[in-house]
């Protein structure tokens, strides 16, 4: 089981290098709610521990070890809090590691974060020193930071930076309501994911008899996340979370004694997750496209109306001119008739000529005068 | 001779700018030597100066001419509807708009986005407007022809002409 999963995670680790490693992260939110200290002890306890200290690992190695660990480890305590955290983490999009970040060691990243965090906190507090005092109290050391927060803040999750930033802000200062987190949660997909957690959790727990670690802390950390999820997702998320928790727990217990290796679930769920992950973007894209389509249709309708209006105007113009023309022709006929009566000696042709070419007579006169005197 | 109103209905000038009316006065407008028929396209650069608007009617009657753009700033989001371009009052019948008094100075079409309609509406006045009786609109954007007509008791329009205009590519601009 362990081996198999290790292989799976390696494969995925390779994929993650290319930027598509969201699946494990999404499938089990629980591991990300551990602090570094807990995570390290977990790895050690499992025997799969890496000899290295986290601080000296580079980010790539850290991620890899996380994936390995979470593959082989399931939290029976993956309950409401974990689910919510999962929602929170997934919302960030895929777990991608920027090139520049992957070669940095965890310690370096941590230092960077601390440097970034202090002015930010200070600004948030309004006062200069207040923020710096609070900051260390909340996150005194790297060891006490949760993996999730670390990853998010380090910028590992890059796809949805705005949401990530909002989440970090929310996690750092829980009473402050996040302004806007796109509501991309979709309850049906939510259930699908819980299923994934269930199965993995049950399978792993059954196979390894692993006991949950650090329940208190994760739930603490995750309550923040659940708050975020609740606010972000609006009314959709809250109810499903509760029901599915019950369902999940019972399912976990029921399946717990099955030793069937159900580990390779990631692929089908990956699909679901990918759908959901890009769900936010897709939804946005679809919405935008729809808006554009509506606008386009309106514009097309206007264009048609314009054309039709112009055509009608021209037709009306044609009609008017035709009538005018007929009227004029009638008038001409009348005039010709009159001329015939007044000058009976004039032939019809001459009259026509006179009408059509009123200067004809004049021309003739002119010619005569030209030829006359000389 | 009165024009047909159908093009105005189809072009949604009747409805968005004025109510259904029966034309009783003939009005022709021309930018330079180019006559304006409903729905024709006029380049903004050709409309920098006020058009020659000739009206029929008796010499003793006075008319008010209003030109607005119901599609500002963009036809799909006309948040400034209507944008006022011109008001001329006290135009004697049988003459042209230059014989009236310009209440709001002419401003040529400047469509930024999309194809805009520019509507010339003619009202018959009940009496001559003297200086105190007029309430000039505060601003060009968000002008309302109907409200203006109602306020000055102009009733229904007697003639309407509209043309379209579209932003010109920079290289074609004179």
From Swiss-Prot, chain A:
InterPro entries: bZIP (IPR004827), BZIP46-like (IPR043452), bZIP_sf (IPR046347). Residues 1-23, 117-142 are annotated as: Disordered. Residues 286-349 form the bZIP domain. Residues 1-13 have a biased composition (Basic and acidic residues). Induction: By abscisic acid (ABA). Residues 288-307 are annotated as: Basic motif. SUPFAM superfamilies: Leucine zipper domain. One of its GO terms (molecular function) is DNA-binding transcription factor activity. It is found in: Nucleus. Expressed in roots, leaves and embryos. Residues 14-23 have a biased composition (Low complexity). SMART domains: BRLZ (SM00338). GO terms for cellular component: nucleus. Keywords: Abscisic acid signaling pathway, Activator, DNA-binding, Nucleus, Transcription, Transcription regulation. GO terms for biological process: abscisic acid-activated signaling pathway; positive regulation of DNA-templated transcription; regulation of DNA-templated transcription. It comes from the Eukaryota. Residues 314-335 are annotated as: Leucine-zipper. Transcription activator that mediates abscisic acid (ABA) signaling. Binds specifically to the ABA-responsive element (ABRE) of the EMP1 and RAB16A gene promoters. Interacts with VP1 (via N-terminus). Belongs to the bZIP family. This is bZIP transcription factor TRAB1. It comes from Oryza sativa subsp. japonica (Rice). The gene is TRAB1.
UniProtKB/Swiss-Prot annotation, chain B:
CDD domains: PEBP_euk. Signal peptide: none annotated. Induction: Induced by abscisic acid (ABA). InterPro entries: PEBP, PEBP-like_sf, PEBP_euk, Phosphatidylethanolamine-bd_CS. It comes from the Eukaryota. Gene3D superfamilies: PEBP-like. May form complexes with phosphorylated ligands by interfering with kinases and their effectors. PANTHER family: PHOSPHATIDYLETHANOLAMINE-BINDING PROTEIN, PROTEIN MOTHER OF FT AND TFL1 HOMOLOG 2. This is Protein MOTHER of FT and TFL1 homolog 2. It comes from Oryza sativa subsp. japonica (Rice).
């Amino acid at each position: 089981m362990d081996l198999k999963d290790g292989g799976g995670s390696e494969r995925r680790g390779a994929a993650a290098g290319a930027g598509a490693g969201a699946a494990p992260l999404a499938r089990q939110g629980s591991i990300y709610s551990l602090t570094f200290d807990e995570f390290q002890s977990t790895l050690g306890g499992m025997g799969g521990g890496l000899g290295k200290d986290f601080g000296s690992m580079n980010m790539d190695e850290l991620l890899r070890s996380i994936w390995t660990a979470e593959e082989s480890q399931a939290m029976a305590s993956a309950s409401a809090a974990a689910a919510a955290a999962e929602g929170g983490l997934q919302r960030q999009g895929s777990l991608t590691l920027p090139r520049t970040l992957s070669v940095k060691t965890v310690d370096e990243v941590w230092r960077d974060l601390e440097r970034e965090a202090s002015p930010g906190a200070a600004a948030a507090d309004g006062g200069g020193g207040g923020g710096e005092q609070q900051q260390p109290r909340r996150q005194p050391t790297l060891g006490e930071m949760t993996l999730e927060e670390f990853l998010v803040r380090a910028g590992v999750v890059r796809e949805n930076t705005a949401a990530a930033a909002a989440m970090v802000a929310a996690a750092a200062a829980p009473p402050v309501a996040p302004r806007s987190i796109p509501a991309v949660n979709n309850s049906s997909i939510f259930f699908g994911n819980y299923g994934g957690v269930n199965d993995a959790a049950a399978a792993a727990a059954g196979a390894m008899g692993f006991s949950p670690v650090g329940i208190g802390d994760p739930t603490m950390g995750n309550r923040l996340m659940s708050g975020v999820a609740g606010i972000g997702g609006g009314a959709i998320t809250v109810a499903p979370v509760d029901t599915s928790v019950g369902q999940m727990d019972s399912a976990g217990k029921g399946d717990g004694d099955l030793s069937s290796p159900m580990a390779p679930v990631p692929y089908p769920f990956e699909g679901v997750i990918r759908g959901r992950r890009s769900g936010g973007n897709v939804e946005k894209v679809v919405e935008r496209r729809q808006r554009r389509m509506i606008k386009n249709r309106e514009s097309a309708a206007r264009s048609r109306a314009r054309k039709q209006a112009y055509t009608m105007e021209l037709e009306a113009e044609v009609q008017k001119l035709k009538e005018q023309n007929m009227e004029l022709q009638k008038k001409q006929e009348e005039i010709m008739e009159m001329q015939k009566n007044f000058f009976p000696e004039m032939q019809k042709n001459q009259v026509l000529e006179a009408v059509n070419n009123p200067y004809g007579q004049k021309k003739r006169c002119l010619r005569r005068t030209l030829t006359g005197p000389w | 001779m009165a024009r047909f109103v159908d093009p105005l209905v189809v072009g949604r000038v009747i409805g968005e700018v004025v109510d259904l009316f029966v034309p009783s006065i003939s009005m022709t407008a021309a930018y330079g030597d180019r006559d304006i028929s409903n729905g024709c396209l006029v380049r903004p650069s050709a409309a920098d100066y006020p058009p020659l608007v000739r009206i029929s009617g008796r010499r003793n009657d006075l008319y008010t001419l209003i030109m607005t753009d119901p599609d500002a700033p963009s036809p799909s989001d006309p948040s400034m509807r209507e944008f006022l371009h011109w008001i001329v009052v006290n135009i004697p019948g049988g003459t042209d708009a230059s014989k009236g008094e310009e209440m709001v100075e002419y401003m040529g079409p400047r469509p930024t986005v999309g194809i805009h309609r520019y509507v010339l509406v003619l009202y018959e006045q009940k009496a001559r407007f003297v200086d105190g009786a007029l309430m000039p609109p505060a601003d060009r954007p968000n002008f309302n022809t109907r409200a203006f007509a109602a306020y000055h008791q102009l009733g229904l329009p007697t003639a309407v002409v509209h043309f379209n205009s579209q932003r010109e590519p920079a290289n074609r601009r004179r």
